Amino acid sequence: MVPKLFTSQICVLLLFGLLSVEVSLQVKPQQFSWAQWFSIQHIQTTPLHCTSAMRAINRYQPRCKNQNTFLHTTFANVVNVCGNTNITCPRNASLNNCHHSGVQVPLTYCNLTGPQTISNCVYSSTQANMFYVVACDNRDPRDPPQYPVVPVHLDTTI
């Protein structure tokens, strides 16, 4: 009986650990609105190598981010996608604030390959042209006033 109880307690602790990791991935730095954080993480008009580009994201986190996608387009172009028809978010079916880009854009997918020490994160880069799906919300007072609805989350690429 004791080994089973001990094993189940470990499983519960592991589950809470995994949930806290997942929740921590959703945390943004307080000084940014969700749209500003989206822009930092996902908008890159001129492609850079991932190891360099990811420094701008990792400086706000206590660890190397495992993966990230940069859209090579402008924030204004992504804001325009927010005007497309609402769809259920492919990665979170409980949300209906997603929008399909309708056109492919060049993008870079970054994947952590090297040491996970924050001062020395190393990434591989994969280039592609793909559609994307973003979640959009009403603007925060810190967001540009010309955009009443802004992108806040890159849900998926297709």
Curated annotation (Swiss-Prot):
Active site: 42, 153
Residues reported in the UniProt entry to bind substrate: 65-69
Residues bearing glycans: 34, 86, 92, 111
Keyword Nuclease part of the UniProt annotation: yes
Keyword presence, Glycoprotein: yes
GO molecular function: lyase activity; nucleic acid binding; ribonuclease A activity
Enzymatic reactions: an [RNA] containing cytidine + H2O = an [RNA]-3'-cytidine-3'-phosphate + a 5'-hydroxy-ribonucleotide-3'-[RNA]; an [RNA] containing uridine + H2O = an [RNA]-3'-uridine-3'-phosphate + a 5'-hydroxy-ribonucleotide-3'-[RNA]
Keywords: Disulfide bond, Endonuclease, Glycoprotein, Hydrolase, Lyase, Lysosome, Nitration, Nuclease, Signal
Highest taxon in the source lineage: Eukaryota
CDD domains: RNase_A_canonical
Subcellular location: Lysosome; Cytoplasmic granule
GO biological process: chemotaxis; defense response to virus; innate immune response in mucosa
Enzyme nomenclature, EC number: 4.6.1.18
Leading EC class: lyase
Range of residues in the leader sequence: 1-27
Disulfide cross-links: 50-110, 64-121, 82-136, 89-98
3'-nitrotyrosine: modified positions: 60
Coiled-coil residues: none
Subunit-structure text: Interacts with and forms a tight 1:1 complex with RNH1. Dimerization of two such complexes may occur.
Family statement: Belongs to the pancreatic ribonuclease family.
Protein name, entry field: Non-secretory ribonuclease
Protein species of origin: Saguinus oedipus (Cotton-top tamarin)
Source taxonomy: Eukaryota, Metazoa, Chordata, Craniata, Vertebrata
